[in-house]
Regions:
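Glycine-rich FAD pyrophosphate-binding loop
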Residues: 105-126
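Iron-sulfur (Fe-S) cluster-binding segments and ferredoxin-like electron-carrier domains
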Residues: 375, 507-518, 541-559
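Dinucleotide-binding Rossmann-like beta1-alpha1 core, especially the glycine-rich loop
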Residues: 129-223, 232, 349-352
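Helical element adjacent to the flavin cofactor pocket in flavoenzyme catalytic cores
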Residues: 235-293, 301
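C-terminal catalytic lobe of FAD-dependent flavoproteins
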Residues: 2, 8, 29-33, 42, ...
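Active-site substrate-recognition segment that forms the wall
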Residues: 88, 98-105, 115, 161-167, ...
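N-terminal targeting leaders
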Residues: 1-92, 96-101, 105, 131-133
């Protein structure tokens, strides 16, 4: 479909949803640009989504204003040149760090820039950690292609980086409730759920070369006693994987660092300089980096980064997913991850489920809800109730009082609802790696290889290093060691014998290792992600003061200036004595 036809189709969408609103439409190179105003965020999303569904559309840039719209204030950058790089990667999530590691194989000066104080601080830290096989993705999409390939790469990479990864398997289950909210009569819905749906899944699996099998109701209930008696059938996917997304991201970054990549944390990009139609430099809060190539892996802010270069071809609309986390003891009641199919399916949402984590806890979720604020990681009472309502259909007898925490993460979706990975058609040297929502974790290794091919096609010379080392030695995890191994570790370092976090059996030695790591932990949450201190039943109620003390001692940062997860998240307002006596400086 050419630009003129796309413009006519887009105009009909606007007339349908915003007839009386001042909306301007233009189409360039199969990208739909929307400008003007609408009545609500829901209307903004609806128009963007329908434009994204148009056949042949590459992207949707939705600049429509709505009453709730927030303008993010950017910090001031520094023009002073602080160095040069062949490639600058914007974003320290799993995708950015995968690309950094892949580029570290070559004789290049690579700089990774991350606005947070640590890597894996966005979507990469708050997801269900599933390494999807590709069975749940729309056929023919870039998502599906890269998910299938990335899934096949995981075992080798996680072995090299000493990151936990298991193919625990997943049951995809249909029940008598699967078609309850449709107009299909009950007896017919049950027949479809029991016989037709499993057949469709198996046919799709065969096309993708995935080893999946049908499981009878009897076998399912024998293997998973917590599953509802209303279950009708299931399909088992034995290769469904699980990892720790933040440990994986940290390991990728550490290995990239060891192979020569410069990692700049707490550094925000505020502008991209373009000269004669090509990338010239990246302006950050720490200074300017001269470069000819920028890889935009900025997740929720990818459209803003593209805007800085005059290369915007999409808009990110955040989708929030809330998740409940259960105590490890209760989680032992479930043997494999479980997913329930409910119809009609919510568009662009796989449905979540009861997901086993690599550490043995169970997660219920995630949900999916459009939000306009890219920092909204709240969890509401309504979202918790929605989680219980949906997944109790699958495991009604599961002890719900075993919840120990809840959290939410944000998916960085474009309106075409597919990955947007290509060289900019407007600015030479600017590479889009945007719209990386689920299954981005699974696809990350394949995305990195794809980006490498794009860079090669754009003229970047890639000469392999002979000294590249793909291996990374992970820190010791004392709770996983045998008694003899523990004794040896404690003999070498007595701090491994001092328990700080009782719930997760984390020692002082492990916390010190995290603080002294190649990418050092400088916040309470950074230590939590590396060691699990504070992730147990008491959620840091016991160990938090001790973690703060160790962090202060090792870094020289006063305890009252220690942060939870970023520069504005101080845990304390000051020392109690000086506050009471009025001697505080501030």
């Amino acid at each position: 479909m050419n630009d003129r036809k796309l413009a006519r189709k887009a105009a009909s969408i606007v007339r349908k949803h915003a007839r009386d609103k001042p909306v301007h439409i233009r189409v360039e190179d199969r990208v739909v640009y929307l400008e003007g105003a609408v009545s609500s965020y829901e209307e903004y999303v609806r128009i963007g989504r329908e434009a994204g569904r148009l056949k042949g559309v590459r992207g949707v840039v939705n600049r429509l204003s709505f009453p709730e719209k927030m303008e993010r204030k950017r910090p001031v950058g520094k023009k002073e040149c602080i160095g040069e790089a062949d490639v600058v990667i914007v974003g320290g999530g799993v995708v950015g760090c995968s690309i950094a590691r892949e580029l570290s194989r070559y004789r290049l000066k690579v700089v990774l820039v991350e606005r947070a104080e640590d890597v894996a601080c966005g979507t990469s830290k708050a997801n269900n950690a599933m390494v999807h096989t590709g069975i749940g993705e729309k056929m023919g999409t870039l998502k599906q292609k890269l998910c299938v390939k990335g899934h096949q790469m995981y075992k080798k990479i996680t072995d090299e980086l000493q990151v936990p990864y298991e193919q625990q398997g997943l049951y995809i289950i249909t029940t008598r409730d699967s078609f309850a909210k449709t107009k299909i009569p009950g007896f017919l819905g049950n027949f479809i759920a029991k016989h037709i749906v499993p057949l469709i899944i198996l046919r799709r699996a065969k096309k993708l070369g995935l080893p999946m099998k049908r499981v009878s109701r009897k076998e399912l209930l024998e293997n998973e006693p917590q599953v509802t008696e209303r279950a009708l059938a299931a399909v088992y996917s034995p290769t469904y994987g699980i990892t720790c997304p933040y440990l994986f991201t940290i390991a990728l970054a550490e290995n990239a660092l060891a192979n020569g990549v410069e990692v700049m944390l707490d550094t925000e990009v505020v502008d991209i300089t373009v000269k004669d139609g090509a990338v010239s430099s990246v302006v950050t809060t720490r200074g300017t980096i001269d470069t000819s190539f920028v890889i935009n892996a900025a997740g929720l802010y990818a459209d803003e980064i593209a805007d800085m270069a005059g290369a915007r071809e999409y808009t990110i609309h955040p989708k929030k997913g809330a998740t409940l986390l259960f105590d490890r003891e209760a989680s032992a009641l479930i043997n494999r991850s479980l997913s329930i199919l409910l119809f009609p399916r919510t568009e662009h949402y796989k449905g979540g489920g009861l997901m086993k984590t690599i550490d043995g806890n169970l997660q219920w979720g995630p949900t999916m809800r459009e939000v306009f604020d890219p920092t909204d990681t709240s969890v509401t009472a309504e979202e918790i109730q929605a989680i219980f309502a949906r997944y109790s259909l699958l495991a009604p007898r599961f002890p719900k009082n075993a919840v120990i925490a809840y959290f939410s993460g944000l998916r960085a979706a474009t309106f075409t609802e597919d990955f947007f990975i290509e060289a900019s058609r407007r600015v030479k040297g600017f590479i889009h790696v945007a719209g990386i929502q689920s299954p981005g974790l699974a696809a990350a290794p394949a995305i990195a290889e794809m980006v490498l091919d794009i860079l090669r096609g754009e003229g970047l010379e890639l000469e392999r290093k002979t000294a590249f080392n793909p291996y990374r030695k992970g820190p010791p995890v004392i709770r996983h060691l045998s008694p003899a191994e523990r004794e040896r570790a404690i003999a070498e370092n007595p701090l491994y014998g001092k328990i700080v976090c009782r719930c997760e059996e984390v020692t002082e030695g492990e916390i010190v290792d995290a603080i002294r790591a190649p990418i050092p932990a400088r916040s309470v949450d950074a230590i939590k992600r590396r060691t699990r201190a504070g992730m147990g039943r008491c959620q840091g109620g016991f160990c938090l003061p001790r973690v703060v003390h160790i962090l202060s001692r090792e870094t020289g940062i006063p305890a009252e200036k220690i942060v939870k997860n970023g520069r504005d998240s101080h845990l304390f307002v000051g020392k109690a004595k000086c506050l009471l006596e009025g001697e505080c400086e501030n």
